[in-house]
Structure formats: structure tokens, C-alpha cells
Regions:
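Catalytic-core helical/loop segments in enzymes performing group transfer/polymerization on anionic/lipid-linked
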Residues: 1-497
Length: 497
């Protein structure tokens, strides 16, 4: 986000944490998504930009629009809950002997056919003595309803369960009133303040009514409801710093103080990543953190959110264990792979750059590979004319491996997939905007940076030996971000009191 300085970001984090800790045991305060400042990426900080960008009259007009949007969305959500209640599927009866619960994500339809979970892989089976002793609950981001997904899971005899979109009518109303009450409290506390401190509280008050905040509290009640049926010893979630993760931990502790909450830090940790590193009230903190590599383990140990023995390097499926001798730079390929993140604004930035480079370097090919959350068809339709005029630019629907094999350069911003590209011998180039905080996940490595076509031209004209040498150094450093999966390390959790 341009013109959002590090000083503003640090001030924002401090103020949001202060508001959270004023009611450190209140689930509705902890469930307010806007108070959990995840990291410095534009995807996350764009929601806070009006605090610093707008003067009073513009800011309050913005607040009014946010309030109106939240109320309309809330009304439509509750209307849907009411009319769909008679046809809602019955709750799944759970095996009381289940010892481990995993909360994961179904990001796209193709994930349904996977034999293993996208994030945890074989850990649910490895961690439990028997296959029937673990279950994976999915946050559903596919085009299928949870009811349809669960029929498919039963057909495949999988120990998977897609969480419903909503709870009962009564519970949904209870969530809304709880968040509304806390929103009024935050707004009341803002009356004696001025400037940006006041604006932060006013935005938090409005965002207490958002669907994201409702989702976090809903995850609390989902977890509580699950634990009414079974008494697991271990609960796993992905761990990025989102409010819903903390609410799952709190619900588990509410039902059983002895349950062990484990967060899996599966992605890279950014330079200014905040919510993942900061401690809240005990019941909202994980008991253990599994990291994806040595670098993540070191960063979290320094944060002191947990003792060192409770931060364990589990590894990641993102690293290729078969690549022992890293691939070297291949100058003869002349293809550039673009890796935008799962945000349409980020996709637009990368697509525009691809067309800009295409106009100046017509002999090269440009492959834009999108995140699973992005609709390729939607973007193909939008950029139909430009794609016809620039035949050397294509939006990929191939496998990642095929795209990597065809390319020798990779242009990225905040994606962690760049690590896999580096492993495969692609020369990394970070695309930055003027006057923005860096969102480079490889911020502590000497990576070439471009702002436009002129910068890119300088890189491709560099001596090939220099690029090969630099890539080797980058590859050596990058091995610390993602380690091969080590299930034995994860099992150490069972031996630590």
C-alpha cells in the first residue's frame, strides 16, 4: 500500500492490541477481525488506509458507507439463515473416541479429490494411532455447498467434514447482538479521544458488525459444539494471525483446559508480520506452534510467544525433497513466470506489468499463474482483447511444475510460491511499487527489484554467469524457509507437558 509508512503500521498495531487487551477475555472483542493486524501486505492494510488518508468529513462518510454495507450484508445473511433453516442438513454425529481435530481449508473444487489435506498432508493419520482417531473440519471456499461436500466425503470414506456456512437462527442472532454490544462499547470509549486513535476505535466499532467478525465468533461456537460431542486431546489449525484461529483455541480451552492447541505456521513470515507473533490472554494463544522451516522457527522463538521447546520445525510440503542439487539458471528459455497472490488488485498489477514487458520484449513469453482463489476465466474475459493482441502473454491453467519447467525468470510480490520457483532454477525478481512498504517475503536476501520495464531490461542484459552465481546464493539461503516434512518432530508434542 503506497504512502502507508512503517511508522503508521507500528502505531496501528500498538493501538489495535491495546483495544484487544482492554477486554482480553471477551470473545466478541477478540473476534473483531479488524483488531488483528495480520501483516503489512496491501491485501490486509488497505482496510486501515482511510484512518490515515481521509480528513474528518471524508472519514465519517467512509464510516457511514462501511456501516451501511455491514448492515445490508448482515440483513441478507440473517434472511438467508432463516429461509434455509428448514432444509439445512442435520449435524454430523461424531465418534467420541476421536483424539485429534484439524481445522483446514478447501480453497477450490479440485481439493476434494485429494487423498491428503493440502496443508497438513499425512499428519492427521500419523498423529493418531488409528485412522478413525482424527477428523478434519474444513472451512469451505469451494463452489459446492457443505451438504454436497459431506456427501462426497462419505462416498469416499474420508474422515473429512465441511463446516456449514451458518449456525442456528438463535445462535446467529446471539452472535450479532454480542458483537453489536461490544461495538457500542468501543465507540463509547472513542468519544474522549482525538485524531487517529479515535478513528481506529471508530473503525473497529463499525467492523464489529462485519461478516468477518461474525465468522470468527461462529468458529468459536462451531468448536464448542464439536467438543460437546467429543473430548479430543489435540486441536490443530493453520496459523497466520487471523482472529478465528484464536477463537478456536479459546473455545477448546473453555470446554477442556487440558486440550492442546497447535497452530501450523505454513507460510513465510513477513518482515512486519504482527498478529502471529503477539501474545493475547492464555486461552487465546496456541500451546504449540509447528513451523514450516528453520527461519520461521527462529523468528517465532525471538518473538517469545511460546518457549523454544513448544515451537517445533515440522516442515512443509512446499519444498521438493527430490531436488538435492538445486537447478541452475537456464538462459535459453526466455520465459517469465508471474506469481500474483489471491487478490484481484494484486493480479491486475502483475497482469499490467506482463503486458508492459510484452510490448518491449516481444521475443520473450509471459506466463501469469494465479492463486487457487482467483477465477482464471473471469480474468481471461476481462483481458480478452489484450490477450489477443499479445500472443506471448498467457494466463496459465497448467500445473505449477509445467509452468516452472518452461520459465527461467519469476516475478513476484508477496507470494511464498517463489521458493518453489527458486528451487527449480528460476531467477527471482521482486516487483515493487513506489512509496510502499516492502512486502517481499525474501526481505533478508539480496533480490533484484524492478519498478517498471526499464529495470527489467537491465536485469535480462546482465551477464549470465553473474545471474547463475547470484541464484546459487539465493537457493542456499532459501532452503531455511521450507524444510522437508518431519512427522517425528510433530509427534514430540505428545511428550512435552
Amino acid at each position: 500500500m503506497q504512502n502507508f509508512s512503517e511508522k503508521k503500521f507500528e502505531f496501528l498495531c500498538k493501538q489495535c492490541d491495546e483495544i484487544l487487551l482492554e477486554k482480553k477475555n471477551n470473545i466478541f472483542r477478540q473476534g473483531n477481525h479488524i483488531l488483528h493486524v495480520v501483516r503489512e501486505h496491501p491485501i490486509f492494510i488497505s482496510r486501515y488506509a482511510p484512518i490515515f488518508k481521509y480528513k474528518n468529513h471524508k472519514f465519517y462518510f467512509f464510516l457511514f458507507k462501511r456501516f451501511a454495507a455491514n448492515i445490508i450484508k448482515l440483513f441478507l445473511k440473517n434472511f438467508y439463515v432463516i429461509i434455509s433453516f428448514p432444509i439445512r442438513a442435520k449435524d454430523k454425529k461424531l465418534n467420541k473416541k476421536i483424539s485429534s481435530i484439524f481445522f483446514s481449508h478447501l480453497l477450490r473444487d479440485s481439493f476434494i479429490k485429494n487423498d491428503e489435506d493440502f496443508y497438513f498432508k499425512s499428519l492427521p493419520d500419523k498423529f493418531s494411532k488409528e485412522r478413525s482417531n482424527s477428523i478434519i473440519f474444513y472451512i469451505n471456499n469451494t463452489s459446492y455447498s457443505s451438504k454436497v461436500l459431506n456427501k462426497k466425503f462419505n462416498l469416499y470414506s474420508k474422515k473429512w467434514y465441511a463446516l456449514p456456512k451458518f449456525l442456528s437462527v438463535q445462535k446467529e442472532i446471539k452472535i450479532s447482538f454480542g458483537l453489536l454490544k461490544d461495538g457500542f462499547k468501543i465507540f463509547k470509549d472513542s468519544l474522549n479521544l482525538r485524531g487517529e486513535r479515535k478513528k481506529i476505535r471508530e473503525l473497529a466499532a463499525i467492523e464489529s458488525l462485519s461478516l468477518n467478525s461474525h465468522f470468527s465468533i461462529r468458529m468459536f461456537y462451531f468448536t464448542k459444539k464439536i467438543m460437546d460431542q467429543i473430548e479430543p486431546e489435540y486441536i490443530f489449525t493453520t496459523y497466520e494471525g487471523h482472529s478465528w484461529e484464536r477463537l478456536v483455541y479459546a473455545a477448546a480451552k473453555f470446554k477442556n483446559k487440558n486440550v492442546k492447541n497447535i497452530g501450523y505456521q505454513h507460510a513465510l513470515i513477513f518482515s512486519k508480520q504482527h498478529a502471529l507473533r503477539r501474545s493475547l490472554a492464555d486461552q487465546f494463544n496456541p500451546d504449540f506452534i509447528l513451523t514450516s522451516g528453520r527461519v520461521g522457527k527462529s523468528i517465532l522463538e525471538k518473538s517469545k510467544i511460546l518457549s523454544k521447546e513448544r515451537i517445533i520445525n515440522f516442515g512443509s510440503p512446499r519444498t521438493d525433497v527430490n531436488i538435492i542439487e538445486k537447478n541452475s539458471f537456464q538462459p535459453n528459455k526466455d520465459s517469465v513466470l508471474f506469481l500474483p497472490e489471491g487478490d484481484y488488485k494484486e493480479c491486475e498489477l502483475m497482469i499490467d506489468l506482463a503486458f508492459e514487458l510484452s510490448a518491449h520484449h516481444k521475443t520473450m513469453n509471459y506466463i501469469v499463474r494465479f492463486h487457487p482463489l482467483i477465477s482464471v476465466g473471469k480474468l481471461e474475459e476481462r483481458y480478452k482483447k489484450s490477450l489477443l493482441l499479445n500472443e506471448n502473454v498467457r494466463f496459465s491453467i497448467s500445473t505449477l511444475e509445467k509452468d516452472l519447467d518452461e520459465s527461467n525468470y519469476v516475478i513476484y510480490r508477496g507470494t511464498t510460491t517463489v521458493i518453489k520457483a527458486i528451487e527449480h532454477g528460476l531467477y527471482p525478481i521482486y516487483f515493487s511499487l513506489r512509496n510502499e512498504m516492502s512486502i517481499n517475503p525474501l526481505h533478508d536476501i539480496d533480490i533484484d527489484i524492478i519498478f517498471n520495464n526499464l529495470d527489467f531490461s537491465k536485469i535480462i542484459l546482465k551477464n549470465e554467469k553473474i545471474k547463475k552465481s547470484k541464484l546459487k546464493k539465493i537457493q542456499k539461503h532459501a532452503t531455511g524457509f521450507f524444510s522437508p516434512l518431519n512427522y517425528r518432530e510433530a509427534l514430540k508434542i505428545k511428550t512435552i507437558q
